[in-house]
Amino acid sequence: TFPAAVYRGARWWVPVALVNIAVMFALGIWMGTHPHVISSLVPSGAVRQLVEHDFKNYYSAHPATDFAARVWTNNALVAAGSLALGIFLGLPTLYLLWVNCVNVGVSGGILAANGKLGEFFALILPHGMLELTAVFVAAGTGLRIGWTIIDPGPRKRADALAAEGRPAFAVALGLVGVLLVSGVIEAFVTPSPLPTWARITIGAIVEIAFLAYIFGLGRRAARAGETGDVDEWLRADAPPVAAN
């Protein structure tokens, strides 16, 4: 049910991913090419601390197992918030996406302005590809729920919300596992002594495997009629969900 539910929601989360990546790059380029903006927003001491110590040390300051658990919990909460808060017309979801864009874009811009763009990507890409994809899937699902409240179509609003909410629950459960994988990569691969190309390759392979899972197995399941909804006998009297 998870790959089918994520595949059916691709028309929401894929645009979310593309827009957010564009915003991150725009913020990063703007910050990286306008040092005076950085100096006006962030004290020079804080910039130096981030560039020389904090950004790199963040990934190795704690035992890997503890760090993986911490990262997994934090990312799961962010993803769950992005998804669940969609019920408030998607507005909190949009806010969480903006905060995420600012965090990534500004950090990248600051490191780029100080000649460490390579280090930024070397430490972000191994785990960040899968992690951000999971966040975008959660956010897209949340926005879909929010739009269902705004425009339920021919269904009653409560029925429409229930019909979209049940597959969203399957997405949420599946993302717990996805974020566990990204957390393990962040704790054990990102700070490892492996060459940069090897660490990024590992992250890319995992990301490609996830996308193949969604657009391969998920697509076939959706075409076979799987919606990500719970079994019919568990739906009470809710109307069936038609596959897109």
How would you describe each model-predicted region?
Residues 183-201:
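Extracellular/periplasmic helix-loop-helix junctions in multi-pass membrane proteins
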Residues 28-54, 98-99:
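Interfacial/capping segments of alpha-helical transmembrane domains
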Residues 122-126, 157-169:
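Membrane-interface segments at loop-to-transmembrane junctions
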Residues 4-22:
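Alpha-helical transmembrane segments and their helix-start/interface "positive-inside/aromatic belt" motifs
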Residues 224-244:
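Short, highly charged, low-complexity non-transmembrane loops/tails of multi-pass membrane proteins
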